[in-house]
């Protein structure tokens, strides 16, 4: 045994418990056993696939419930089970342990008796095994005297020695620790594992709905020479191979539209985007979006797609209602449409139109305690006033539409000539969940808008888009009329994947923050 294998490493936060566990690891190695074996092997060195705890329970729990097996019964069925030790009780000649394995956190009791495993093996169990260790056990399926399905162990082996103690749920796992060390959260909290499964179910459902409509999933570049597709501040990096400054994508829009120009007429992508902006309970620097584009569709078709996606996800999770501090969200009712200018006018008691001067809007902002930038023009002021005054009041699903043109430089002018654009934001529970446009495909107007954006960028606006000549070149080849949709996947999960009331199945009573929905969110380094 090499000194390197047996030496205790220098760990900055070494505790007495960790030191004891390292000594147990050393004893395992000194005795010729492995603390971290490659797997469970037979005498000839062949791999033995462990039996899943869930499968053992699925076979025998119904027999217990039906009375075919009762307390004290034994079977001749020998199983090989692997799991993490989450409970242990050692007595004289009989030891008990709960083993946990699988995404569902399935558990089964292991019983080690002097008669079955022998004196030395039982002594080793008592002296070498701690909470948090992974172990292999081989033995017969039995029912304990207390009526609990168990494995009467005849042989055990270490699968992975835990050096750090398992956390105590309420003592060691505050909210900050749960987010920073998600592996601990997953280890001890079933709710954390359940949220991971719900997230996976939601993304599968989104894909299914789109693919049922003939969409094809694409993968587009994360590193970009020109940032665009949204108004947001990008992360900047440098490609050494080309000695070229680049940015991380803030949206997937422009490459997906290029694909539609090329003839892939229904496309989507679910992927991470990166925005170098604020961090709070609803915003993360990196987050997951869905974007999809459909030739010969418009904002109304995309509204149908959005509603179908969200309702399908709710149905998969069994969600029928979502309770908030402001009331109950009903996804099954009518999804309303609210035009920006009339909606804001009603909220402030003053008629606001595209002709309302910026000075009047600043006076309204001051009256309603809305902070504004003196450099903002009238369109920007309308957008901010609506977002601060009206948006938080929209509880049930509402498509907010007829925005001023500067809100979305990639949306087409409204067909009714109202000096607005064909774009909507979906607001649910006072929060934007997604957006869609009738896409701007006129390359002349698009060049004008992106040129205006590039001038803002050159003047120091970090959120303005840059002029993407290749995207404009694609539009100049002729893009079909199309609708486009963007959905914040994390915010959809926040809406639907919260804890449900056990007394009222289907009613979500607590919505998680964005840091809970992202498995490993970006966190400020610990001091």
Model-inferred region functions:
Residues 1-527:
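Class II aminoacyl-tRNA synthetase catalytic cores and aaRS-like
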